[in-house]
Amino acid sequence: MSNFVLHPDLERDGVLIGNFQLSRVLLINDSNYPWFVLIPEIPDTSDTIDLSKIEHERLWEESRIFGLAIMKLFNGDKLNVASLGNMTPQLHVHHIVRYQNDPAWPAPIWGKHPMTPYSELQLKRIRELFTSAELDNFTAAICNG
């Protein structure tokens, strides 16, 4: 996986939370929602059908593990999981914890409200959640500060 390069959109909007065996996990820097993306670190993939059978199974197992964890950590009402890629062609799977009182409920979040970046303290706390969480085959990003 040495040829993997993160798409500039994901680099710009994401904050590294950690890594699974296959996927990099980013927090989208929008404090309106607990919004994460899993990005399989495989070059030149834009859709799940580009993955091998084993990679495909691994991605959805990582998605299941991560989804369970974030619903518990953020006490959500609903978990939205989607792989769109219309604007950012690199394969990435959104995991968005939704609340009945969130700014866009019940509609999709895209384009509803301007992104509101997390404060450094908020980012630190979210990283600490994942440092202490025990997710199978997950390595949390180093939490500085």
Q: How does the language model describe each region?
A:
Residues 1-91, 95-145:
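HIT superfamily nucleotide-processing domains
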